[in-house]
Amino acid sequence: ATDATPEEVRALFKNSRIIGRRFRLVHIRFGRDIIEVATFRAHDEDSPKTELDRHGRILRDNTFGEIEEDAMRRDFTVNALYYDIHDYSVLDYVGGLKDIEARQLRLIGDAATRYQEDPVRMLRAVRFAAKLDFSIEASAASAIYEYGHLLAVIPPARMFDEMIKLFHSGKAVRVFELLREYQLLKHLVPALDEWLQEDPNESMLDFIDQALVNTDDRVNTGQSVSPGFIFAILLWPVVQQQATRMQPDRQKMIGALAQVGETVMKRQVRHVSIPRRFSQMARDIWTSQPRFHRTQGKQPLRLLAYPVFRAAYDFMCIQ
């Protein structure tokens, strides 16, 4: 972060570009890396450079200010620390160091206002709490129940990005627990939340837990996890239940899984905009499951040649 405006930063670095409309930033290329540079911001609702919607959500915030003002615009105290490269000191204007010692996630300012400004802060609270093994301070935690519904105004494309951050954090098991605890799952995967409210069978809950354990293991060892696999996990209880009701005959299950999978996914993308390559992968994983029971003739060889065979096989093994 700097007191230089985006235009001033852009003028200093030829290998840079200004990005963003809501929050203008500068991306500076440094070899293969991109360094993101933000200008200190100030709070000024009356400025023409600050725009709010009817819910109080910040649509645009490009009112620049001083470092002390910028600290107050950050979401959490632990995320408002500044490293001074001149004397190697840490500048703390909001008590962030004390909260780190207490392993506590505290919002800066009034919780209701901060969540209304950007409802995604509730998801960030869950992600940071899970990733850092911190508790969420009482007022910040209680406000999540009241303002969780504001996630409905967030564009589905942004919700997809946040979902991936949550479940690719290496702490997906804890993330899932916190999303359920704070009643946020219904805004991300409503079909799964409804299934959980009914009377979910323990074996399927064990499946979700083990699948997320495996996901965390892969992330923490530097291996990739496709978003398609994540959504296949989270929606499988719903898809399997509805497909079984539609077609009890396991020999005819593939068609039922395909039909139900399409319906469930169509509903899901209204909340979280899943790119087609990932939604199709999830559906292919589901329809592959009955094929593992077909061992006659050339059917196993056909399954081996399936594009999602490896992911589908891992999925089957977890079950």
Per-segment meaning from a language model:
Residues 1-319:
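Catalytic cores of the polymerase beta-like nucleotidyltransferase superfamily
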